[in-house]
């Protein structure tokens, strides 16, 4: 139910506005279901690495599906870039726009391809339907196109500025084929792009149906109400905060090519009706692909504000207006062209963690949490299809341990913050690719000990069944960037990446590694970070310790040495 405003910025029909808001969300949910169910690549159909949104004719976000928070910046950026390049009067019914470039089209990294379709009513542009999907490969020297060690956007794959993919209903098949020919699996790319176009058609038809049912004036008035209400609701939350400045930082292990750690620092300043986020103090632009484009930075900030102040607030343009963001140009949080950005999700996660840390100075203990795994590790396996021309690219980002909360343990084996994708089921992996899952498990003792325990990390070990499989990975929190505990809680366990584990040929790999050619029967094991603990381990309730021991989440050694308890007495309690 819509809450009352603290000033005269009231709504004529709060209940109707709430119903309308949910109508918009139902349209985006239907669009997302279409995109997921009809797609061909495992990264979209199984892992759901995609998002959808609706914009008005002025480019304001009206509604976004509940998928990937990090996509919020790219979709907004794409919409802005389209309207900057194309005057509204030049856009025709049946046009389709495509883009992905962080510098030329306000994207976040090249694998995230935006498709935007105008929605007309009675001959006039009224809305846009948009979606974004992470394609498993867009070219470049490393399969997957997200390697942390690349040093230029020119090396990361095909760059697509704002481009008309269709004009007045006619798709430019030559352009579509040109884009797909620059990837390792043109057939899969082509099919997924066509699904993206179809998804927008479905969303456009739903918006036209809503206008037909309610009337155009009522729809436009309701859109204004929804955006205005979101803004006022966030202002109410800001008014509850203590004014002042709060600084926190997190760290990357390195800049993608080794070397020293890189700081990600934010200063949050609370004003009477504004939040200001200043990233001065963050490290200089990375040599590798760890750089965070400014629209991805904005998405990180919007996500954190929504998650911490009002998780149920509708994500639309009203959320953005009271928030100011500054990041010096030429730093890792606002890189200059042609800096590489393919591994930007690691940095986005760390930025979100830093913002959560800054809010610790504002929120009561029961509303803060320890740091989570905050790094979004990714693995990529590539090779030749056995049944058709081209190469397969299996890409997956992995979860880990979430940070412990005041009164509950951190969630185990989960994506945190900005990603929100699903795991690829073992059956799907082994059915699609010449790979075998040796192990997929949670790692005992990986969550930081505390009164409440950090979430457990994931171990995933995959074996090549044929020779010539090419492996790449990008991760973090192998050295300094671990999940920190709060209020006496211990840090979470570090991440690891190992080739041929538990064999005479075992080899520890660098966290950002690329193009390792595996022979048949060779394997790679990735261990993700655990979450930080909350409160001193000695304060942990015996019943929780007993349950952890029975579930295998902590070892007897940890119970004795870290928690300081006698195992037999805990088991019998």
Where does each model-flagged region fall?
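Glycine/proline-enriched, intrinsically flexible loops and inter-domain linkers
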Residues: 2-93, 98-572
